[in-house]
């Protein structure tokens, strides 16, 4: 019988001096409240722009699946070498005739009550097709051209405390940019993560299971810590819990930071029957 190692990982980063406090991490998933248009205008980034006439949508959202469908949506003049064609011919692409080419804009007004001075804020896009330009409160926070990757942006400098914030996202699918239907729009979830100044960054935890036996398993965890200016890594320690599917703690480990560890906690936990 193989040991089941499907465990939940719980991590707390503790400051060793003065007041000890666990890391606070608040995550928001932005699903409702979005406005959408296929028009294109530079004024759409402005927080006070009136988008009341835009379409109300829920994210994830794909603008192309609603049609209209047709050959003109991706008409191409090309020679398809795989089909033995020697000269360019008219084709409808291989994208199913969906109207994915062109520009789309999304806007959202949102609150972030956990954000305050000294906190860090990260926007995470699980999927945005494509050439995403992201604006927060009228300022460009970042650009990500590739539509198939999750990406994240540090929006701490642009977020406002204690008031509404405005997120605007411009997406553009270019002509002849795909050999299949690639999707269109914010086709996966959008998240805002607010952390303390000392925090585990996005994708800052690496977990492997180098040994899995019938009666025990070893779990190796590497956790990166972003250390605030003026602080030292050896002033922090990490407390890690592994929980089973029912939420029961099956093993724990603590480790103090060291100035020789390059701001990475390395731990090996053993889980046994």
Residue ranges and their predicted role:
Residues 136, 217-258, 265-267:
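Beta-strand-rich binding/interaction modules
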Residues 26-30, 37-40, 96-209, 228, ...:
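Accessory beta-strand-rich segments of carbohydrate-active enzymes
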Residues 39, 59, 143, 252-254:
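Residue-level detector of high-confidence beta-strand sites
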Residues 22-87, 166-172, 186, 192:
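Accessory carbohydrate-binding/adhesion or oligomerization-edge regions at the termini
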Residues 1-25:
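Bacterial Sec-dependent N-terminal signal peptides
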Residues 209-217:
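Short, solvent-exposed loop/linker segments at the N-terminal edge
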Residues 149-151, 261-272:
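Aromatic sugar-binding surface patches on proteins
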